[in-house]
From Swiss-Prot:
Signal peptide: none annotated. This is Serine/threonine-protein phosphatase Pgam5, mitochondrial. InterPro entries: His_Pase_superF_clade-1 (IPR013078), His_PPase_superfam (IPR029033), Mito_Ser/Thr_phosphatase (IPR051021). Belongs to the phosphoglycerate mutase family. BPG-dependent PGAM subfamily. It comes from the Eukaryota. Displays phosphatase activity for serine/threonine residues, and dephosphorylates and activates Pk92B kinase. Has apparently no phosphoglycerate mutase activity. It is a single-pass membrane protein. Its EC number is 3.1.3.16. It is found in: Mitochondrion outer membrane.
Amino acid sequence: MRKFTAFACGTGAGLLTFYLTKLNEPKAAVHNSWTRSEKPVDPCALWDHNWDLRDPKSLVKPVKNDLSQEQNRYNTELEKVVPKHARHIILIRHGEYLDVGDTDETHHLTERGREQAKYTGKRLCELGIKWDKVIASTMVRAQETADIILNEIDYEKTKVKNCAFLREGAPIPPQPPVGHWKPEASQFFRDGARIEAAFRRYFYRAYPDQTKDSYTLLVGHGNVIRYFVCRALQFPPEAWLRISINHASITWLTISPSGNVSIKYLGDTGFMPVNHLTNRIPRAAKNVV
């Protein structure tokens, strides 16, 4: 009987220990997976507030001493360079086009591509945006897309600017690499510098003298837009090829006065009929991209 009692006590103690251990495990699991920790998991997760070299604090001489006059001087100069309004940059990919011939001059929009551009123009019109600037890539498919969109929105065609920096290209070797698309290193070297220059030309926080939110429309290309999205949101730029955007889609990025960047739309084509949703060469047709 004593042996049985000892065995029962030992078993009970073991089960109690096991139960208490398992009871505490969920708390540890929740703590380890808690995503609201103030300490970033990786230094890359930290936001660079001076990404455009226009952080107000970087534009003003720092305080030299503790005197009130010096502090007043600093505050006065800082106030003069602080932006008050946001910049909205809306990026449109060209419509579907015919990949015929070896030169850009023969790469015209398909009939569906022209209809895609018209749907996009109507959608932009519905949004009621008053455009400050409209800029288009100099490639034929982007020019044709922009021209169709301009028929639908309130903006004078004579004011449109053309920019060769926005032409399609290979921005940076993607990660992970893909087997079906391997440009030469020289192409990345050449195109990458140009596309990065385009990003720096169009992406920056508002200047202090900007009196209202501004809206810029850029009509360009898939690779360029995807690279811009990664750079603007401070994602690894090598990740650009992981993103897919449809023809004539709308991507909307906002740069707030603080320099923070947010994305409102990414490749939006929800306003188009299903049979107009394309992003690459259709199976039923050759030489169309």
